[in-house]
Amino acid sequence: MLMAALSVAQTHIECVGTATQVVSRGDTLFFFADEVHLRSKIGAADWYSTKTGALVQSNAEEIYPDDGGYYLRKAGVNYTPVYAFTYPDYAPTGLEATVTPYCRKTDLKLTGTIPAISYINENGASRTYARACTICYTTLAWNTEQWVDSVASQQETLRTGTYQLLPIYRATDVVVRWDDAIAEALGLTADSVVATLTEPHAITCMPTTITTTRGGSERSNEIDRPKEASVLNGSAPLEIAFYSNPTPAVEYFSWRIYHGSNLIVQRQDADIRYTFMDPGAYRVVHSVSNSYCPCADPVDPDCQQDSVEILVNVSESQLLVPNVFTPNGDGQNDEFRVVYRSLREFHCWIYNRWGKLVYEWTDPAKGWDGTINGRPAAEGAYYYVIRAMGTDADKNAKYVGIKASYTKGKLNASEALIGVYQLSGDINLIRGSK
């Protein structure tokens, strides 16, 4: 009886016994678990060989022929041929597998004897059935948090020679199984051969970052502050931890940080932490390598230094000063606070109308709550003096014409310098009602 059909085609010949049917390149092939046994669906007829064209048996309903192709002739009509094979006779012998790791690929080599399942069709053309094989192995895959085992498979045609596989990142058995569907349909165990990869050479990494956040209402006046650990841009100081997350075969690490085209940092640790201060665009280039894959030539298939680029952007400094605040306890505008980003220095002094210093502070995230020595200050105009340095200011920049004291009139004008803030002006304290 017909055990299973991998693909069904309409023929006038059927197989008898444990067998299965396959359609390949338009031809119908029968594979038998033991001897070939064919039966006509149109009653007794003449049986012919597709290979020789010779009559095999006349006026017969069933035949037990050798492997090959056969067609029926009845009443002068030739019917579509079939091609029959005793499957166990085509089992590979002496088949061995060896696996060779490289940086960008893995080679699997099969040696031994694989008998060809060949036949001559009704047109006299020689054909060979392409036997399917599946190559399976375990490698590593990134699941957004870590490397985990992942079973990979590759469909190929069974042959001797070398197969090229993807890079394999962990030790594993590489299993080659062939004719799975045919063997299953015949109730047989599919044959296989195993090669063991003990020392993978392939490497890669999956860098991740964690940015130190500055959240909360106490810093709500900082523009572009990093509120989430995933951000890669914002107000300085921007502190970011970089993690390589390498595959097991990685031996060496390289981190290079470029500000524009200038290399400013180079480290060889697996994980690093860096605080970005100067505004602008940065490139963080991470490379991994090992003794087998030491170079970065993308043309060389046997050499790899897997590099990943991460882009970071630091905001330019900015400092804005309000001219009024209302410390009445309603939760809105209750403090005199500047709006800022990317500052490395800050100092603010508050004077009353008589020039007396009433408050000062050095953290731009903080401000004046409108009290003097713990008591509410009188409503009216006050005077502020601010000096601050942005992270984009020249390291040798100096303040000009500002002292920590009040002088009636305007402050002396100074040469405009990027990132240097020398500000002064009136601030109006209005209490009103909540």
Question: Which residue ranges define each predicted feature?
Answer:
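Extracellular/lumenal mature domains of secreted and surface-exposed proteins
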Residues: 10-38, 44-47, 51-52, 57-319, ...
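Short loop/turn motifs at secondary-structure boundaries
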Residues: 239-243, 291-292, 310-434
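N-terminal signal peptide c-region/cleavage motif recognized by signal peptidases
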Residues: 4-6
